[in-house]
Every structure is written in structure tokens, then in C-alpha cells.
Amino acid sequence: MPQLDTSTWFITITSMIMTLFILFQLKISNYSYPASPESIELKTQKHSTPWEMKWTKIYLPLLLPPR
């Protein structure tokens, strides 16, 4: 059975890691980040739900004083 030649593994793995690093750096460099995220105000939207339109009273019989 022939012996496995591992002499080229180091250069192959090293070049693969370097290539992946460069590709990820190029991918990340295309994103544009805001200069100061604290200065941006987010507008909150009020969602209308059907139970907000109605007046409801919750009775808690266990908390009512005895008559």
C-alpha cells in the first residue's frame, strides 16, 4: 500500500486560509456602516389593536372586599 504524500498539505491549507481571509475582507469592506449609530432616532409606530378601541374593566372577584 503506497504511503500518503503530505508534503503539499501545508502550502495548500495555508493558501486556502489566506484566500478565505482575503475574500471575507473584501466582502466586509463593501458594507457601509453609519458614522454614529447613537445619533439616529428610530421612529416607533403605534399598532392599532382591536382591544385598544374598547373600554374594558377587569373584575377580580378574589380581591373585592367582602359584603
Curated annotation (Swiss-Prot):
Q: Where in or outside the cell is it found?
A: Mitochondrion membrane
Give the keywords, sorted.
Acetylation, ATP synthesis, CF(0), Hydrogen ion transport, Ion transport, Membrane, Mitochondrion, Transmembrane, Transmembrane helix, Transport
Modified sites of kind N6-succinyllysine:
54
Q: Where are the transmembrane segments?
A: 8-24
Spell out the Pfam families in the cross-references.
Answer: ATP-synt_8
Matches recorded under InterPro entries = ATP8_mammal, ATP8_metazoa
Q: How does it assemble?
A: Component of the ATP synthase complex composed at least of ATP5F1A/subunit alpha, ATP5F1B/subunit beta, ATP5MC1/subunit c (homooctomer), MT-ATP6/subunit a, MT-ATP8/subunit 8, ATP5ME/subunit e, ATP5MF/subunit f, ATP5MG/subunit g, ATP5MK/subunit k, ATP5MJ/subunit j, ATP5F1C/subunit gamma, ATP5F1D/subunit delta, ATP5F1E/subunit epsilon, ATP5PF/subunit F6, ATP5PB/subunit b, ATP5PD/subunit d, ATP5PO/subunit OSCP.
User: PANTHER family of this UniProt entry?
Assistant: ATP SYNTHASE PROTEIN 8
- Protein name from the UniProt record: ATP synthase F(0) complex subunit 8
Protein species of origin: Sus scrofa
